[in-house]
């Protein structure tokens, strides 16, 4: 199904709203790239998935999910037997945690006997969890930059010795803090060595090693001789600490080498479930219902609402096609909402074919088309110095060359932009071609010749956007069987 036609209906805006209901970067990406399926059984499956997610939300609350990191680069490193950083290990532990919580959510939502009959079981059942590995990583890590002291007994011992040695150094250096030789009464660190700030004129008064000067040269940072050995001991302890951290990171990475494929599957399943539950949350937000998917090539929408118009202002309409007529001609004033009706119809069909619930009353039914074609509004080709009429004709010719008997065609102001008589005759010819090829067509027009043609031709029906004569304003209601006044 070609996205250029869907974009004319503003389907991309629907997907953008849907993506906001997804939580993970994968779910959002899947939502933004959603394309209607033209496989009836697949559409039914997608609708069933949305229905089960809808029920699970009402039964057990929302899926326990937060934004997740992209761990695919981490897994690639593991496949090369690399040692992961603290942050990367923490990222993977978070994925394992979310995976476990997904399983717990599903298990608590379903009776044991229901699990395997669940539509979503095939996704949840593929998710791998390992609390032992998850717990080992979380227990070892303090935050994304540091390990806990208890990550190993050796690390705990080394860090105790570090703190002890640092305190010994500070105790010795504190004796200098009351000295007139210091620029400031503080102990600081230069080149990983504890030093004191000495006034440059007293450099000979404190024996030790100079590790730097202030920008003005008035201060020298001196490591006194009486802490030299302690600073050396501290440096050795820090080297031992780094080596022990490396050993711990290696040990934790070793836990993950054999489960990289499981984690890749987890990411995939988390993204798919995030999308499915996003569909359900979107349905709840717009008070949508599950459409009936029929095989008889008709569409019957009851009190349907445009999904991009606020529910406070949108006027629900009833619209059907395919049972008693194949071509529906919509007429009425330019401000009466004819184009909105076209877009509503196309959007609803596209949404249903993506597994989305539709903003319509229960009992509304949709056919799974092999393609949805639309000629609505002006195209970029107009900017390439084609007239409005020529632009529409280029689009329509492409549509006529591509349609099948299972296609839906939406035409806005067919035949407009040229001589009215020629435009009306051209419109009739195009509609007859589509009718003879058994295509379902919705078209708007302001030509009376087309309205009259629909009145006397089998398979055609008129409809109009109602206009309030007394108040001189459109009501936006659709009246099928009644031609309108343009």
Q: How should these model regions be labeled?
A:
Residues 176-191, 280-303:
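Long, charged, glycine-rich C-terminal linkers/tails
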Residues 286-289, 294-486:
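ATPase nucleotide-binding head domains, primarily ABC-like/P-loop NTPase cores
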Residues 1-144, 150, 154, 158, ...:
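Conserved amphipathic alpha-helical "coupling/scaffold" segments
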Residues 128-146, 229-250:
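Extended, charged coiled-coil "arm/hinge" scaffolds of SMC/Rad50-like chromosome-maintenance ATPases
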Residues 12, 44-47, 65-68, 96, ...:
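Amphipathic alpha-helical transducer elements in NTP-driven molecular machines
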Residues 190-221, 231, 294-316:
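SMC-family hinge/dimerization module
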Residues 238-272:
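Non-transmembrane, heptad-repeat alpha-helical coiled-coil rod segments
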Residues 155-202:
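Extended, Lys/Arg-enriched charged tracts that mediate electrostatic binding to polyanionic substrates
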């Amino acid at each position: 199904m070609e996205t250029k036609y869907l974009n004319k209906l503003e389907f991309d805006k629907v997907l953008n709203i849907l993506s906001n209901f997804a939580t993970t970067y994968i779910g959002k990406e899947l939502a933004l790239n959603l394309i209607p399926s033209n496989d009836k059984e697949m559409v039914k499956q997608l609708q069933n998935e949305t229905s089960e997610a809808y029920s699970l939300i009402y039964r057990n609350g929302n899926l326990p999910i937060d934004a997740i990191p992209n761990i695919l680069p981490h897994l690639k490193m593991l496949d090369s037997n690399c040692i992961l950083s603290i942050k990367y290990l923490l990222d993977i532990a978070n994925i394992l945690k979310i995976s476990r919580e997904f399983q717990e959510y599903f298990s608590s939502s379903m009776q044991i006997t229901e699990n395997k009959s669940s539509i979503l079981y095939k996704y949840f059942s593929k998710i791998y969890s390992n609390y032992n590995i998850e717990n080992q990583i979380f227990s070892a890590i303090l935050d994304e930059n540091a390990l806990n002291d208890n990550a190993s007994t050796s690390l705990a011992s080394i860090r105790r010795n570090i703190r002890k040695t640092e305190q010994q150094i500070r105790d010795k250096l504190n004796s200098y803090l009351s000295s007139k030789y210091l620029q400031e009464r503080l102990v600081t660190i230069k080149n990983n060595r504890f030093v004191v700030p000495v006034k440059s004129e007293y450099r000979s008064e404190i024996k030790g090693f100079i590790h730097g000067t202030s920008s003005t040269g008035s201060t020298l940072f001196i490591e006194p001789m009486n802490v030299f050995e302690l600073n050396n001991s501290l440096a050795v302890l820090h080297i031992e600490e780094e080596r022990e951290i490396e050993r711990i990171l290696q040990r934790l990475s070793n836990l993950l080498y054999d489960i990289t494929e499981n984690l890749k599957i987890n990411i995939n399943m988390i993204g798919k479930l995030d999308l499915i539950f996003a569909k359900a949350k979107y349905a709840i937000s717009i008070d949508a219902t599950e459409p009936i998917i029929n095989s008889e090539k008709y569409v019957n929408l009851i009190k349907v609402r445009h999904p991009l118009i606020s529910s406070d202002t949108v006027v629900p309409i009833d619209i059907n096609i395919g049972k008693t007529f194949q071509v529906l001609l919509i007429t009425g004033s330019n401000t009466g909402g004819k184009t909105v009706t076209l877009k509503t119809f196309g959007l609803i069909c596209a949404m249903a074919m993506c597994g989305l619930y539709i903003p319509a009353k229960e009992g509304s039914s949709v056919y799974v088309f092999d393609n949805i074609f639309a000629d609505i509004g002006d195209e970029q080709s107009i900017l390439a110095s084609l007239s409005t009429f020529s632009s529409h004709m280029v689009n329509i010719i492409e549509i006529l060359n591509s349609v099948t008997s299972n296609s839906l065609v939406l035409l806005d102001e067919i035949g407009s932009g040229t001589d009215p008589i020629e435009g009306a005759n051209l419109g009739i010819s195009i509609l007859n071609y589509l009718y003879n090829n058994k295509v379902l067509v919705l078209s708007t027009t302001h030509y009376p010749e087309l309205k009259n043609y629909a009145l006397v031709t089998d398979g055609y029906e008129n409809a109009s956007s109602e206009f309030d004569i007394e108040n001189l304003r459109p009501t936006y209601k659709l009246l099928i069987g009644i031609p309108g006044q343009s």
